[in-house]
Amino acid sequence: MVNMKCVALIVIVMMAFMMVDPSMGVGECVRGRCPSGMCCSQFGYCGKGPKYCGRASTTVDHQADVAATKTAKNPTDAKLAGAGSP
């Protein structure tokens, strides 16, 4: 009877280990960066696999795009600024 309980416990523990996805994340990206060999997901978490590395954009890329958009000059702004000048 004791042996059967031990076998059942071992089987349950083994199944629990098998259910853990090896590509599960290890935490949040810090300033858009992750430990070596890991990718930053579009939601800001580090991990391996297509859920994290599948898309080309990373948090760093997104931040660079936002910064570039904020600093880009709108061509219509220049026309409006010079509209009242001779």
Swiss-Prot record:
One of its GO terms (molecular function) is chitin binding. It holds the Pfam family Chitin_bind_1. Coiled coil: none annotated. The keyword Ubl conjugation does not apply. Disulfide bonds join C29-C40, C34-C46, C39-C53. Residues 56-86 form a propeptide. It comes from the Eukaryota. One of its GO terms (biological process) is defense response to fungus. Residues 29-53 form the Chitin-binding type-1 domain. Keywords: Antibiotic, Antimicrobial, Chitin-binding, Disulfide bond, Fungicide, Plant defense, Signal. Residues 1-25 form the signal peptide. Homodimer. Chitin-binding protein with a defensive function against numerous chitin containing fungal pathogens. It is also a potent inhibitor of Gram-positive bacteria. Its chitin-binding activity is strongly inhibited by divalent cations. This is Antimicrobial peptide 2. It comes from Amaranthus caudatus (Love-lies-bleeding). The lineage of its organism: Eukaryota, Viridiplantae, Streptophyta, Embryophyta, Tracheophyta.
